[in-house]
A protein has these predicted regions:
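Sec-dependent N-terminal signal peptides of Gram-positive bacterial secreted proteins and lipoproteins
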Residues: 1-27
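Ligand-binding clefts/hinges and TM-proximal coupling segments of bilobed small-molecule sensing domains
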Residues: 141-167, 249-274
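Ligand-binding "clamshell"
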Residues: 96-108, 122-123, 195, 200, ...
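Short, polar/charged alpha-helical segment
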Residues: 34, 40-64, 73, 77
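A bilobed periplasmic-binding-protein/Venus flytrap-type ligand-binding module shared by bacterial periplasmic
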Residues: 115-126, 229-244
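A conserved helix-loop-strand patch within extracytoplasmic ligand-binding domains
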Residues: 108-157
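Short helix-initiation/N-cap motifs at beta->coil->alpha
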Residues: 65-76, 164-191
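Beta->alpha turn/N-cap motifs
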Residues: 42, 69-71, 81, 85-95, ...
Length: 274
């Protein structure tokens, strides 16, 4: 009788061991598929593309979103391992953030370009712009530089800098139409439309002027000078060694599909970069 109890006890111990072992394997398998993604508070367009990505990854990854309200937060959360990857910024922002915070987050994949545009209430084409016309651009270093590169891309000026180098009006080497560049706070450029011939307005502020991206008379081109403004998915330098690396890769692969490209084109004025 005592022997039976011992045998039964050993059998139960073995059975429980198998159960707990299976549970641990299952939990480990699940955790290796969980990817925490840091984003800014979802806009309808961002939500639409991520909804599609979630469907495409299927059971290869389980995405958990953390929404932030401050642009300083997602990168810090990624560096602190509170999230695995983030999707909210362009190359330029990440590079500057790394320098300022002495971190080494890296771009994992490019996503889209949110081009800035030239608007006008006075002309329907830049070809109609008269000599001596006034153009309003943002006055901060980042957006002002980007605006000048757009003017160069439009054929209105030439600069003696390119790529990542910050451009100022002092870098203008050719201005055949003698355009007058008026530098204003970015938030004031929509109001300036009534007083200037054309204005370069950030996407953030076009609604203030009751404008739509389709109203633009010129759109920033995707070239070597605009590369720094391409949005990206960013993560930690050693992300490929993380236990959820395959799940992260599945998300990157899902983003770069024709299905997501279609969602971006159907729901926004952004330009996919693949």
């Amino acid at each position: 009788m005592k022997l039976k109890h011992i045998v039964l006890g050993l059998a139960l111990t073995t059975l429980l061991g198998v159960i707990f072992s299976n549970q641990e394997v299952s939990a480990s398998s699940t955790s290796s598929k969980v990817v925490k993604v840091g984003v800014m508070t979802f806009s309808d367009t961002e939500k639409a593309r991520w909804d599609k990505i979630e469907k495409l990854v299927g059971d290869k990854a389980k995405i958990k979103f953390t929404e932030f309200t401050d642009y300083t937060q997602p990168n810090q959360a990624t560096a602190n391992k509170d999230v695995d990857i983030n999707a909210f910024q362009h190359y330029n922002f990440l590079e500057n953030w790394n320098k300022e915070n002495k971190k080494n987050l890296i771009p994992l994949e490019k996503t889209y370009l949110a081009p800035i545009r030239i608007y006008s209430e006075k002309v329907k084409s830049l070809k109609k712009l008269k000599k001596g016309a006034t153009i309003a651009i943002p006055n901060d270093a980042t957006n002002g530089s980007r605006a000048l590169y757009v003017l160069q891309s439009a054929g209105l000026i030439k600069l003696n800098v390119s790529g990542k180098k910050v451009a100022t009006v002092a870098n203008i080497t050719s201005n055949k139409k003698d355009i007058n560049i008026q530098e204003l706070d970015a938030s004031q450029t929509p109001r300036a439309l009534k007083d200037v011939d054309v204005a370069i307005i950030n996407n953030t502020y076009i609604e203030q002027a009751n404008l739509k991206p389709s109203d633009a008379i010129f759109v920033e081109k995707s070239d070597k000078n605009s590369k720094q403004w391409i949005n990206i998915i960013a993560g930690r330098k050693n992300w490929k060694k993380q236990k959820n690396a395959k799940a992260i890769q599945a998300i990157l692969d899902a983003y770069h599909t024709d299905e997501v490209k279609k969602v971006i084109k159907d729901t926004s004025a952004d330009i996919p970069q693949w």
